[in-house]
């Protein structure tokens, strides 16, 4: 998946591995998304990225953006090159 964030930044999600990308997200956070009623994580991520983030910053592991969707906060962590490292609910 390749998309542009509202600020124009190019972001993309690859299959990845246990540390980053879709495999990391599914392995580490699938249950969190299921608890929110979300089954198709890549499609949901694509929808989330169309919204304007409520917060952006740089944490100890790199850049992130927080989004509010249906009353739930989600974090997208990405590399400086736009590679999506992780995605998960933070509420």
Per-range role (PLM):
Residues 1-91:
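Ribonuclease/tRNase effector modules and their secretory precursors
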């Amino acid at each position: 998946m390749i998309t542009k964030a509202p600020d124009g930044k190019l972001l993309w999600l690859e299959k990845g591995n246990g540390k980053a990308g879709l495999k990391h997200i599914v392995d580490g956070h699938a249950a969190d998304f299921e608890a929110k009623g979300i089954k198709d994580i890549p499609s949901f991520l694509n929808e989330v990225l169309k919204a304007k983030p409520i917060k952006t910053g740089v944490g100890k592991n790199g850049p992130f953006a927080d989004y509010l969707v249906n009353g739930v906060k989600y974090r997208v962590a990405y590399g400086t090159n736009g590679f999506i490292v992780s995605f998960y609910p933070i509420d």
